[in-house]
Structure formats: structure tokens, C-alpha cells
Amino acid sequence: MNNFLLKPLFEKKADPLTLLLRDIFKDNKYAMSYLGALSIGLGFSHTNTLNAEEADSSVEEIIVTASKRATNIQDLPMAVQAISAEELEAKNITDFDDIAALSPSITLDSSGTGNSYFYIRGVSDGGFGNRAGAQASTAYYIDEQPVSTIGGNPDPHIYDINRVEILKGPQGTLYGSSSQSGTVRIITNKPDPSGFEAGFDIERGDIHDGSTDESLETFVNIPLGTNTALRISAYDISNGGWIDNVPSTVSFYYTGATIDNSSYVEDDYNWIDKSGHRIRLGHDMDSGTTIDLSFLSHESFSNGSWETDVVEGARKNSRFADETFDDEFTQTSLTINGNLSDDIEFTFNTSIFDREIDYTYDYTNYVYTNYYDSYSAYAYDYDYYASTDARMFYVENDQYDRQSTEFRMQSTNDSGFRWILGVFIEDQELAYSTTYNMPAISNILTSVPGRWWKQDNVREDSQKAIFGEATWPLSDKTDLTVGMRAYKNEADFDAKDGYMGYYQDHPILSWAAGRTEKYSKDFSDVSPKINIAHKLNDDVLLYATYSEGFRPSGTNRLNRQARESGIVPATYDSDTLTNFEAGFKSTLADGKIVLNGNLHTMNWDDFQSTSYIYDLLTVAFVQNVGQATISGLELESYFNISDSFSASLMLALTDPEFKEDIYDLQGQLSTPKGNQLAYVPTEQFVMSMNKDFVIRNRDAYISYDHSYTGESYQSSANTDTNASYSLANLRFGVNPSSKGSSDADDIVGFLQNASLEVYLENVHDSDPTLGIYDDFGDVRRTGSKPRTIGLRLRYRF
């Protein structure tokens, strides 16, 4: 599908709006496709070709809070994709990888659970998740709190969720830093005092040429009087592995010693266990004020690596040490909603998010190759170290603490002049410790047995902001919205590291210089937004937006060589993404068809990129590198063709391009003008179909999902590519209870509330490249989970 473009879909004389959009986006190669789709929408809005007997089967309406107030998604003049509770359940969405598979606007770069990074609209800085790297370009929220973290986002289990909202494009006004390319919001279910509700889900799946998946999920909603309710959900999941750690050897250059990994050989060794719960207490006061207290806890422990070694063959690798990933996080949140007057309502939220990761990783190939680039040869004369086993592994401990508080007020009216005004305060700390261990290193040289190098770093970021938006009606059909966020960010970095247990210079080895450093960086700015929305009629909304998103500034950690060179920056500046967007939303054919689309051009100025220079700095650093432009087209279509058949098609076309030559700090051309941003496919689409029917008086369904991701580059140098790929899932489900029968007619009466589903995930057993890492002298890639066939029992009381 290279160079895939929709052809213009209209030939009639252009109207003034079309001419205006043509002029604004004349340099965007997708503009004609977009205007063609818009013309179809306008044409449909004046026709009704469907039978009256089918008029009640309209596309589901979804209420979202992306604009900080509850709004029908079709009335919201911004690009938002919402995945409802019904769709989450029907498609068995359990983690962020599943969410990304349903949105063509999201690009996922994965190296395994807890180590996934994602981008919206192709805003990829090419980073690799280093803890010393730049902040994320996409914000990730659980309810009212951002939980994005440097070096890999948390992956909460998706169960008992009300909806997922994907806000596309910069959201700097209402959502602040890291909402640069967009925002993903996980909205959990609230307690409901109106009645008792409970259920459970049991699942088992068999992985092709792998192990098995098993899960148990449950929830209960308990009214505690007329105004109070408690909602609890919990899960216990074991996901089997499919990657084999195969026998291998490595020989070291200086000593000629050869070691093998026989102690670590294992089939299907990349398994993961997950468990957690969420407790939420809600109380509605007689005054109309609601109080909501929530606590979430999640723990996952994974064994092995999701990365495979290309030289070993498909779904195989060779590791010379144990690799584990233990990820625990909790979120405690208090939310109060109420009215200050008949015309003004308020929301107060304060949340604490804590996360701890313990991580081990095999670094044997790093010793074998990259150290020769980083240090003098004598540093690896293993005879000098009296070492015949130079394998290495590192142990990392990360502790994230994030506290955020927001208070906002807004007018209660849904039309006329309306406004929102708020303040946001956040403090986050990342304390991470990494130890590089060489078990056979000579104890003569190290004060701590087996230790080669250790670092202890504390990274603190704080943000204070005032934000607001105001909407004025210019006419009965046209609204103008102006928004602004004034913010101040502060970053502090305390770093210390040293070789062989010494945080200062080594007493014997002159090259082994330790260090203790402190860095600080402050930054303040304003992020604006302008939006104009026009209701062409009751079915079609047109809008145009200018918005900005940003990532905060920060500091780097430098060693002595880097400081003395004077070319590695001690700090880096904030980067800004400006967005020009024109879109439409249409609900057509008596609600049976929804067609939405937008055309956008985004300019990314002085964007932050994380990189290495091995002969100067053995750790990652961030620099502002240059300018890129990302142009794109997004289309969403939903069809309820009949009462029993529905379909959807979503499309994203992206043109991510460097607008100037990029040079590295040593003056070498690293990225020529015109190259594409790393990891960004130029085309993606997602197609779904669902058919409901009756089998022997029992309700049944079959659904099919298909996604396509185009080719992308592994780096901004545009040399190696990730091939395009498709993934498909198939589901068949039935309600064991007879349609219209009494309990006595069923084998067991309780089956009236049960459903049974057989599913086939990754139908074609595809193994696409989802992530790539080549920093070890070999290439490590993350692929897709193999074909999995399973059975799921769902019961609702």
C-alpha cells in the first residue's frame, strides 16, 4: 500500500468552504482526499435512502468528557475516538496493545509489557525509552490523573472500564505537558447506588507453538443506602510464553574464553503473571455534590524477554542471564464534583500515583561489542582482570512518585456563552538505580563483589499551570472557542555514578572516574488554542482548530569526558508542536451512518531526541535537534447496515518529514532533509464487522477485526525498514439460554445471564516487527503474539 492515496471523490464546482480549505492545506497531499470525503458527507446529509422499518438501528451515541464537560462525541468539534464499554467487552480489550490495535492514529513501539511507547499522529522522536530520556509525547490518563512515565508507560489491565477516549492532536490547553501529540484517557466505572450488579469472566487460550493463557476477572457494585455505593473489581491473569531461549555460546576476544547459556535454556520462557484490584466508593450528597474515592493496585511479574534475536530465527533468542520485569503501581484518587451556584459547577481532584519497577537484563553482547567503542582496549584485557567469564547483566530499580491536583470551575450551560477555568499543580519524582554486574570480575579492583558500574539518579519535575477556555456564539450555528494555558516547569537532576563500587575516582584505575552532579532547568510559557465550529445542519458539524502541545525542558547527566568536550548539552529546551486542523462530523441516514474526518498539518520545532555518543558519553542524553512537519488525514466511518449487521472502517494517512538537515554533535550529517520520522507508518487502517443472528432459538454473533500497518523506518537515517503487516481476530459467541424461554427450559437456569465465546486472535499467525533495538551489536526485535485460540465464559448477575 505504498503511496496509497484516496482519489478526489467529487467533480462538482467547489463551494466557498472547499475553496478555503484547499488554500489552507494546499501543501498537504491528502487534502483532495479529505475534501472528497467531506463532499460525500454533505451529500448524504440531504438524503435518506434507508427503509423506514430499519430506522431504529442507529449507531451508538457515546458521551465523552474530552473537553472537561460531558458532550455527545458527535457534537464535539475536535478529533476524538471513543471505545465504549460494550466494545471493550465485545473485543476483549485487556491492555494498551489491544487499544492501539483499534486506533489507526496510534503507533506502538513495544519491547514487552511495561516497556511500550506510543505516539499519536506520528509524533515520534525516535527515542528508545531510556530513563534519562525525554518526556513522552503522548499523555496517558487514568480518570483525572496523568500517569505517563519516562522510559515506558504503565499498562493497567482493562476491565470494568466505562470507555477509552483517544484525543488526537495537541491538547496543551486543557491537558498540559506531554499531551503534545494527543491524550489517551482510561475512564473507569463509577459506583452506582441505584442497584446491585456483579459478574465474572473466565478465559483460557492456547498459544500456537507456545504455552497457555488463563484469566479470572470479577466485579461487584454494592449499594450502601440510597446515595452511596461501593464498586470493586479484581483480576488474576497468567499469560503463557511463546519465545524459546535456545542454546548458544560466546567467545571473548582477549582471553579466548568461551561460555554457554545452558543454565538458562528454556522453551516458552516469556510468561507473565498479573493481578490487581480497584476499589471505588461514591457518595451523592443531598446538595448535589458527589464525592468519589478510588484506589487502584496492579502488579505484574514477567519472566524472559519479548525481544528475539534475528540470527536465532523466529521467536527465539539466546540469553546468558535471567531476565525479569516486576512492575507494581498504585493510584489513590479523590474527586469532588458540585455546584458553586445554579450557573457554576466545579471539579476538584487530587491523586497520588506510585510505581516501582525491578528489572534485570542480559548485557553480555554489550560487553562483547559496544565496550570496545566506549573505552580503551586495556579496559577489556580480561587477563588483567583475572576474569575468564566476562558476561554482564544489569539490575535496575525505578521508583516513580507522581502527585497531581486540579481544581476547575465551569459554566453549567451547554449553549450560549460558556467557559472553563482551572489550576493544575503536579510534582513527580523518578529515582532510579542501575547496577552493571560482571560476576567474574576481579575482587582486587572492586569494593563491591561482581560490580562493574553503578548509577543512582533522582529526577524531579514539577509543573504549575492556569488554564481556561471560553466559547462565544457568533450566530445560531457558529461558535468561537479561545483557550490558553500558562505554565511553569522546573526540572532537577541529582546524579552519581562510579566504577566497581567507587562514586569518585577509582583509587587504582585512572580512567574509571566517578562523579556526583546536580543540574536544574526552569521554563515557562503559554500554550494557546483557537477553534471555530459551524453546525451546517442538525447532522453535520464543521470545525477548524489551531492548537499547541509541548514537552517540558530538562537536564542531562554528563560524565567527565562529555563535560570536557563541551559539545554535549547539560540541559535541553522545551519543544512545541503546532497544529492546524480542519474537520467534520456527520451523522447520516437517520443515524445509521457516522462519517467523521479531519485534515491536519503539524509543525514540530526544535524537537527533543534521545541519543548516544559512545566515545564521549556512555549514557543517553537529550538534545533539541531540528524541525519536522507531519501532515495527515484521518477518517472514521461507522455503518449500521441493518438491525443485525454493523461495520466500521478507520483510516490514518501520515506524511512525517524532516524539514531540515540534522547533524549530530560531532558535526556529521545524521538525518537528511526529507527523511521520515522513525517508527511512523504512512498508512494505517482498522476494519471491523459484526453480525448478530439466532441459532436454535439462541442469540449468537460473529465478529471480525482486521488492521493494517504500513511500512516504517527503524531510525531517522531511513536505512532499515519495518515491513508492513496485517493482524486479524475472529470471534464467535452464543448465549446458552434459549431466546424467549423460561428458566425451566434451560439446562441450568443461571445460564440466562451467561455468554460463551470462542475466539481466534492473530488469525494468520503473523509475526510483524512491533519494536526494534540494535544497541548490542546484534538486532533485537519484538514481534507479535502467535495465533491463539481460546474460550471465554462471561456471566452477569
Predicted feature descriptions by range:
Residues L281-S287, M409-T412, F424-E426, N457-M602:
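Structural signature of Gram-negative outer-membrane beta-barrels, strongest in the C-terminal barrel
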Residues Y375-Y378, Y384-S411, S447, R459, ...:
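Outer membrane beta-barrel strand-and-loop segments of large Gram-negative receptors
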Residues F96, Y117-Y119, Y141, P154, ...:
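N-terminal periplasmic accessory domains that precede
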Residues Y30-A31, N221, Y400-M409, D414, ...:
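Conserved C-terminal beta-signal and adjacent last beta-strands/turns
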Residues I420, D476-L480, N596, T601-N603, ...:
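Gram-negative outer-membrane beta-barrel transporters
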Residues E217, T335-Y363, K535, L541-R551, ...:
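Membrane-embedded beta-barrel scaffold of Gram-negative outer-membrane proteins
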Residues R131, S137-T138, D143-P170, T218:
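Short acidic/polar hinge/loop motifs at secondary-structure boundaries
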Residues H208-N303, E328-T332, D401-T405, M409-E426, ...:
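Transmembrane beta-barrel wall of Gram-negative outer-membrane proteins
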